[in-house]
Protein backbone atom coordinates (compact mmCIF):
# COMPACT_ATOMS: atom_id res chain seq x y z
CA UNK A 1 0.00 0.00 0.00
CA UNK A 2 1.35 3.42 -0.96
CA UNK A 3 1.50 6.31 1.50
CA UNK A 4 -0.19 9.60 0.71
CA UNK A 5 1.34 12.95 1.62
CA UNK A 6 -1.69 13.45 3.85
CA UNK A 7 -1.38 10.06 5.56
CA UNK A 8 -2.45 9.43 9.15
CA UNK A 9 0.11 10.57 11.73
CA UNK A 10 0.66 10.23 15.48
CA UNK A 11 0.58 14.01 16.04
CA UNK A 12 -1.52 15.32 18.92
CA UNK A 13 -4.96 16.54 17.88
CA UNK A 14 -5.32 18.72 20.99
CA UNK A 15 -1.93 20.38 20.38
CA UNK A 16 -2.88 20.96 16.75
CA UNK A 17 -6.17 22.63 17.73
CA UNK A 18 -4.55 24.71 20.48
CA UNK A 19 -1.95 26.01 18.00
CA UNK A 20 -4.61 27.65 15.81
CA UNK A 21 -3.91 31.40 16.02
CA UNK A 22 -7.37 32.67 15.01
CA UNK A 23 -9.52 32.36 18.14
CA UNK A 24 -12.82 32.05 16.25
CA UNK A 25 -11.36 29.32 14.01
CA UNK A 26 -10.01 27.56 17.11
CA UNK A 27 -13.43 27.68 18.81
CA UNK A 28 -15.16 26.40 15.66
CA UNK A 29 -12.57 23.61 15.38
CA UNK A 30 -13.16 22.53 18.99
CA UNK A 31 -16.91 22.47 18.41
CA UNK A 32 -16.58 20.56 15.14
CA UNK A 33 -14.19 18.09 16.76
CA UNK A 34 -16.79 17.36 19.44
CA UNK A 35 -19.66 17.10 16.93
CA UNK A 36 -17.86 14.70 14.59
CA UNK A 37 -16.53 12.55 17.41
CA UNK A 38 -20.01 12.24 18.90
CA UNK A 39 -21.57 11.31 15.54
CA UNK A 40 -18.89 8.86 14.42
CA UNK A 41 -17.80 7.43 17.77
CA UNK A 42 -14.27 7.46 16.35
CA UNK A 43 -11.11 9.01 17.74
CA UNK A 44 -9.69 11.93 15.76
CA UNK A 45 -6.29 11.61 14.09
CA UNK A 46 -4.11 14.16 12.34
CA UNK A 47 -3.66 13.39 8.65
CA UNK A 48 -0.76 15.11 6.93
CA UNK A 49 0.02 18.48 8.45
CA UNK A 50 -3.41 19.97 8.87
CA UNK A 51 -6.40 17.64 8.58
CA UNK A 52 -8.31 16.12 11.50
CA UNK A 53 -9.81 12.85 10.27
CA UNK A 54 -12.18 10.32 11.82
CA UNK A 55 -12.32 6.65 10.88
CA UNK A 56 -10.29 5.00 8.17
CA UNK A 57 -10.88 2.94 5.06
CA UNK A 58 -8.79 1.59 2.20
CA UNK A 59 -9.51 2.42 -1.39
CA UNK A 60 -7.96 1.57 -4.70
CA UNK A 61 -7.46 3.98 -7.58
CA UNK A 62 -8.06 2.95 -11.18
CA UNK A 63 -4.29 2.53 -11.65
CA UNK A 64 -4.23 -0.09 -8.87
CA UNK A 65 -2.60 2.06 -6.18
CA UNK A 66 -4.16 1.43 -2.78
CA UNK A 67 -4.40 4.07 -0.05
CA UNK A 68 -5.97 4.68 3.34
CA UNK A 69 -8.15 7.72 3.99
CA UNK A 70 -10.56 8.97 6.65
CA UNK A 71 -14.39 8.78 6.54
CA UNK A 72 -14.98 12.40 7.53
CA UNK A 73 -12.65 15.19 8.55
CA UNK A 74 -11.94 18.89 8.71
CA UNK A 75 -9.14 21.37 8.25
CA UNK A 76 -9.06 24.77 9.99
CA UNK A 77 -7.52 26.87 7.22
CA UNK A 78 -6.89 30.60 7.35
CA UNK A 79 -9.59 31.51 4.83
CA UNK A 80 -12.22 28.96 5.85
CA UNK A 81 -12.99 25.79 7.75
CA UNK A 82 -13.04 22.88 5.30
CA UNK A 83 -15.20 19.84 6.10
CA UNK A 84 -14.25 16.75 4.09
CA UNK A 85 -16.87 14.14 3.25
CA UNK A 86 -16.40 10.94 1.29
CA UNK A 87 -19.08 11.42 -1.32
CA UNK A 88 -20.04 14.11 -3.83
CA UNK A 89 -21.61 16.70 -1.54
CA UNK A 90 -23.09 18.52 -4.55
CA UNK A 91 -25.63 15.67 -4.86
CA UNK A 92 -27.17 16.83 -1.56
CA UNK A 93 -29.13 19.73 -3.07
CA UNK A 94 -31.90 19.65 -0.44
CA UNK A 95 -29.49 19.61 2.50
CA UNK A 96 -27.21 22.23 0.97
CA UNK A 97 -30.19 24.54 0.42
CA UNK A 98 -30.88 24.38 4.17
CA UNK A 99 -27.26 24.50 5.36
CA UNK A 100 -26.65 28.25 5.26
CA UNK A 101 -23.61 30.18 4.04
CA UNK A 102 -21.10 27.81 2.42
CA UNK A 103 -19.23 26.88 -0.74
CA UNK A 104 -18.61 23.38 -2.03
CA UNK A 105 -16.02 21.27 -3.76
CA UNK A 106 -16.70 17.72 -4.90
CA UNK A 107 -16.06 16.16 -1.50
CA UNK A 108 -15.87 19.17 0.78
CA UNK A 109 -17.69 22.09 2.32
CA UNK A 110 -16.02 25.46 2.82
CA UNK A 111 -17.39 27.34 5.81
CA UNK A 112 -16.43 30.79 7.09
CA UNK A 113 -17.93 30.07 10.50
CA UNK A 114 -20.16 27.51 12.19
CA UNK A 115 -22.37 30.45 13.22
CA UNK A 116 -23.27 30.92 9.52
CA UNK A 117 -24.81 27.47 9.12
CA UNK A 118 -27.49 25.18 10.51
CA UNK A 119 -25.50 22.74 12.68
CA UNK A 120 -28.24 20.09 12.48
CA UNK A 121 -27.96 20.01 8.68
CA UNK A 122 -24.17 19.70 8.96
CA UNK A 123 -24.65 16.79 11.38
CA UNK A 124 -26.76 14.96 8.77
CA UNK A 125 -24.03 15.45 6.16
CA UNK A 126 -21.35 14.21 8.58
CA UNK A 127 -23.41 11.15 9.52
CA UNK A 128 -23.92 10.24 5.86
CA UNK A 129 -20.18 10.51 5.18
CA UNK A 130 -19.39 8.32 8.18
CA UNK A 131 -21.77 5.61 6.88
CA UNK A 132 -20.62 5.95 3.27
CA UNK A 133 -17.88 3.29 3.42
Language model segments and positions:
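Charge-dense, helix-prone N-terminal extensions
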Residues: 1-133
Amino acid sequence: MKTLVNAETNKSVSEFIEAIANQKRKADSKELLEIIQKITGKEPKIWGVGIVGFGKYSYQRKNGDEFEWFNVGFSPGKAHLTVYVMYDINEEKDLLAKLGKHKTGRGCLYLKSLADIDINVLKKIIAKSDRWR
